[in-house]
Amino acid sequence: MKAWVLILMIALGASGCSKDLKEPPLTLLPGAEPSAKSRNDLGIEHYQAGRYLDALLHFNQANFADPTSGETHFNLGLAYLQEGNKEKAIKNFRKARKLARGNPGILESSIVNELLQKNQG
């Protein structure tokens, strides 16, 4: 029995199980580019369902449609963090902060602030 528990723990650890991030992805602000908004909304649906690679696909498409959106960079950061790619998460969180336009969801994010502080923001 102990062997099965150990095998299960190793398998879950190797599969990159999601972290319980306390902050959800952000919706785009009113007036956002329509295709960016629809792609971002799809990304949020996938993210909330735990399908982080699918979420990344849609968040990247939203970012392509509007690269000036701090929210899409924030969402990319969350999804990359869930996938275990801390380097890309940090890159996107830095960009999100630069493009935040006063959005408290980005500027006051404990995830962003803690991660960037640890990695010299």
Task: Identify the residue ranges that each predicted region occupies.
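Conserved structural position within tetratricopeptide repeats
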Residues: Q61-F64, K98
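Canonical tetratricopeptide repeat
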Residues: D41, N75, S109-S110
